[in-house]
Regions:
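N-terminal Rossmann-like or analogous alpha/beta NTP/dinucleotide-binding catalytic cores
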Residues: 2-134, 230-243, 283
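Glycine- and acidic
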Residues: 22-29, 55-60, 216-221, 269, ...
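Glycine-rich phosphate/pyrophosphate-binding loops
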Residues: 48-62, 207-220, 241-255, 468-473, ...
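Active-site cores that bind ATP or allylic diphosphates and position pyrophosphate for catalysis
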Residues: 113-116, 120-250, 256-262, 270, ...
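Small-residue-rich helix-loop
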Residues: 344-446
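Charged substrate- and nucleic-acid-binding regions of tRNA-handling and nucleotidyl-transfer enzymes
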Residues: 433-494
Length: 496
């Protein structure tokens, strides 16, 4: 009994041709870790560089590992990162559906087709999945491999539980080409007859990938180098169906250090974690793009890229075989640069929730505080501790008033505060320029360095040795009344 080929011919007719088509195919099992984000980014860049199509496919066949809400995380992360997809579950496309659990019937049909063509067989052996996963399965001992097809189909029709396994050649070799690692040849005898369709009718990850990549017209498959060992079996599936093999791009892992891969289980950060730690999305993307890829040609020395620049510069030949080490200090360096180069209003908007963590008083201007911070913070999470003195003057050490460079000690500081207080009280122009001009003129009148006057005033108003901005900016933001109150507290603290 041969299969009716109408369905398969219709599926083949839907396959788009003529353009580069890439796919990001995550499983909704949690947050987007750095390696996954890099895969998504490289996949998007390959498509955009070639003027091709970027597809989002949700791989949810492993029902036991699914986490509620994880699909929303995928959509949100891609949107925040600007990795727009041309086809996918939410936008549709010519080869829908784009969720694997909705394609169950397709996998079953193609598994049956492969059985008919001799590339797979029904297996009725009661082997546990854990035994198969651990490599204990020995195809040489599997009596089902050589069952006549009519007999096997009769047992299926009788309701006997089964899986469908790939029939790997017992002899010879299989060679596949990877764009990064070149040609790799393996002995067929080292490959197992992997399960393609499980007892519950759902496909395994490896089988669903091959079917979907072909039917969606995927030209370039980007994934981690841990899948190199599975590539020969993918190739044999393509050959058994008579399909063209896509370009493989296996990327080396992102490492925590020279010995350990990054892993959520070991506390390594996901994209969401990095954002919570105060890193900006553009900085994360720029840094992740360079984790294992180097620009070439006229951009070879370039470090900082916009997304359009990355799309223009990206080429597969620049991807390294060597593992990339995730360096949080280097990411911090990138982030600081991005913060400094933001438009002031954009930085103020990004900084506001972090400013308001410690500055609850709405009278204090977010934009004015942000202006002090932009050149002085590396991450957004640096902000709360830097500006907490605006809401409440901390209980500071009198030793703060002593500064050799400014030529101040407790006695000099007391004198400066006592003398500047009436000047502050009399000042009508409480603007940055007004405060600045008054203090500079008064220091000249006193015959002291500017810093000799500014240092004790800043300490009295902020109660910190290190502040974003100097005395003038801090006094302006605090306002006249609060500045005078804090100067009086400083005089009292110094024994005046």
């Amino acid at each position: 009994m041969s299969l009716d080929m109408t369905y398969f011919n219709e599926m083949e007719a839907k396959i788009p041709h003529g353009k580069v088509r890439t796919r990001f195919a995550p499983s909704p099992t949690g947050y987007m870790h750095v390696g996954n984000l890099r895969t998504a980014l490289y996949t998007w860049l390959i498509a955009r560089n070639a003027g091709g199509t970027f597809i989002l496919r949700i791989e949810d066949t492993d029902q036991g590992r699914l986490i509620e809400g994880a699909t929303d995380v995928i959509y949100r992360t891609l949107a925040e990162c600007g990795l727009d997809h041309d086809e996918g579950p939410d936008v549709g496309g010519p080869v829908a559906p784009y969720i694997q659990s909705e394609r169950r019937d397709t996998y079953g049909r193609y598994a049956e087709l492969l059985v008919e063509r001799g590339g797979a067989y029904y297996c009725f052996c009661e082997k546990t999945e854990s035994a198969e996963d651990s490599g204990e399965f020995d195809r040489a001992d599997d009596p089902c491999r050589d069952l006549p097809l009519d007999e096997a189909r009769a047992r299926v029709a009788a309701g006997e539980p089964y899986v469908i396994r790939q029939r790997i050649p017992k002899e010879g070799t299989t060679t596949f080409h990877d764009a990064i690692f070149g040609d790799i040849t393996v002995e067929n005898k080292t490959l197992d007859d992997q399960v393609l369709l499980k007892r519950d009718g759902l496909p395994t990850y490896n089988f669903a990938n091959v079917i979907d990549d072909h039917l969606m017209g995927i030209t370039h498959v980007v994934r981690g180098s841990e899948y190199l060992s599975s590539a020969p079996k993918y190739n044999l599936l393509y050959e058994a169906f008579g399909w063209e093999v896509p370009t493989y791009v296996h990327c080396s892992p992102v490492m925590r250090d020279s010995q350990h891969k990054m892993s959520k289980r070991h506390g390594d950060p996901s994209y969401e974690d990095l954002k919570a730690q105060g890193f900006l999305t553009p900085a994360i993307l720029n840094y992740v793009a360079l984790l294992g890829w180097s620009p070439r040609g006229e951009r070879a020395e370039q470090e900082f890229f916009t997304m359009p620049e990355l799309a223009e510069a990206f080429d597969i030949a620049g991807i390294s075989k060597s593992p990339a080490i995730f360096d949080i200090e280097k990411l911090t360096y990138f982030n600081a640069n991005y913060i400094r180069n933001m438009a002031p209003e954009d930085f103020a908007r990004a900084a506001e929730p972090f400013i308001r963590q410690s500055v609850k008083n709405e009278a204090y201007s977010v934009s004015e505080i942000a202006a002090l911070l932009q050149a002085r913070c590396e991450k957004l999470t640096d902000i709360p501790e830097k500006v907490d003195f605006f809401d409440a003057l901390p209980d500071y050490d009198l030793a703060f008033y002593t500064n050799k460079k400014s030529k101040t000690d407790a006695a000099v500081s007391l004198e400066m505060l006592q003398k500047v207080l009436p000047k502050l009280e009399a000042l009508n122009d409480w603007s940055t320029d007004g405060i600045h001009d008054m203090l500079i003129a008064f220091a000249e009148e006193l015959g002291v360095k500017n810093a000799t006057l500014m240092w004790p005033l800043r300490i009295a108003c902020a109660g910190k040795l290190v502040t974003p901005g100097g005395a003038v900016e801090i006094c302006k933001i605090l306002g006249k009344d609060e500045t005078i109150r804090r100067v009086k507290c400083g005089i009292e603290k110094l024994g005046g």
